[in-house]
């Protein structure tokens, strides 16, 4: 069992920031179209973190042209180029699935302010 954990720990990415529920982030994902590869930016709110280790994933939600769009990204995937945390959010739940039913200001998340 220790052999599996040691191999898994070698492959975990350490270059990504610590994500928390409610954060507004930009995910730079590599998209392959035929022979070309480009980077597509998907920005939205982190509504769920699942799993641990190599199998850890996060779900990002945004509103695009009035329609809610959610994407699930594996944290340790080579397809995720980088993640930028735009602003931190203050929430009191582990999963923000209730945001799916909310529209406009009701779906807003408070911003975490840094104390000086």
Curated annotation (Swiss-Prot):
Q: Name one GO molecular function term.
A: structural constituent of ribosome
Q: Which UniProt keywords apply?
A: Ribonucleoprotein, Ribosomal protein
A GO CC term?
A: cytosolic large ribosomal subunit
The cross-references to SUPFAM superfamilies, in alphabetical order and at most eight, read: Translation proteins SH3-like domain
What InterPro entries does the entry give? Answer: Ribosomal_bL19, Ribosomal_bL19_CS, Ribosomal_bL19_sf, Translation_prot_SH3-like_sf
- Cross-referenced Gene3D superfamilies: 2.30.30.790
Please give the Pfam families that the UniProt record associates with this protein: Ribosomal_L19 (PF01245)
| Segments passing through the bilayer | none
Q: Name one GO biological process term.
A: translation
Q: What does this protein do?
A: This protein is located at the 30S-50S ribosomal subunit interface and may play a role in the structure and function of the aminoacyl-tRNA binding site.
Of which family is this protein a member?
Answer: Belongs to the bacterial ribosomal protein bL19 family.
Give the protein's recorded name.
Answer: Large ribosomal subunit protein bL19
Lineage, top ranks: Bacteria, Bacillati, Bacillota, Clostridia, Eubacteriales
Instruction: Write the gene name.
Output: rplS
